[in-house]
UniProtKB/Swiss-Prot annotation:
Record SUPFAM superfamilies: 4'-phosphopantetheinyl transferase
Any one biological process term the GO annotation gives: fatty acid biosynthetic process
Gene Ontology molecular-function annotations: holo-[acyl-carrier-protein] synthase activity; magnesium ion binding
Protein name as it appears in the record: Holo-[acyl-carrier-protein] synthase
Cofactor or coenzyme needed: Mg(2+)
Catalysis performed (reactions): apo-[ACP] + CoA = holo-[ACP] + adenosine 3',5'-bisphosphate + H(+)
EC number annotated for this UniProt entry: 2.7.8.7
Organism of provenance: Buchnera aphidicola subsp. Schizaphis graminum (strain Sg)
HAMAP family per the UniProt record, alphabetical: AcpS
Task of the protein: Transfers the 4'-phosphopantetheine moiety from coenzyme A to a Ser of acyl-carrier-protein.
Gene3D superfamilies reported for this sequence: 4'-phosphopantetheinyl transferase domain
Length: 126
């Protein structure tokens, strides 16, 4: 296996809090997949939930080599957890097409948050 993409991102949680305060669920509806949106609506800490997903999606788009542009949208990158709680990524639509073009076989994701920040690292391998 060899690394074909690396992306990282850090976001100030307060920034997400301000956006949610001013625009309600507009950001969540824009960046989350249908499954993520369902979890967001019942999450005990929706601001951190949203901040972590924002960071992961930015990091994943950077690992794909495009950033959020060139047809890749936030809701085409889906974060979920396996039965042990390990974070996993699923690419949809154009993000999936891009990962297939890169011959991506494995996706590694790490997420962390503290009081002020959420950060993520995504590594793609072929």
């Amino acid at each position: 296996m060899s690394i074909i993409g690396i992306g990282t991102d850090i976001i100030e949680i307060f920034r997400i809090k301000n956006i949610v305060y001013n625009f309600k669920d507009k950001l969540a509806e824009r960046i989350l997949s249908v499954q993520e949106l369902e979890k967001y609506k019942v999450n005990k800490n929706p601001i951190k939930f949203l901040a972590k997903r924002f960071a992961v999606k930015e990091a994943a788009s950077k690992a794909l080599g495009t950033g959020i542009s060139y047809g890749i949208k936030f809701n085409q990158i889906e974060l979920y957890n396996n039965n042990l709680g390990k974070p996993k990524l699923r690419f949809l639509k154009y993000a999936l097409q891009k990962s297939e073009e890169m011959k991506c076989k494995s996706i590694f994701v790490s997420i962390s948050d503290e009081k002020l920040y959420a950060c993520a690292l995504v590594i793609l391998e072929k």
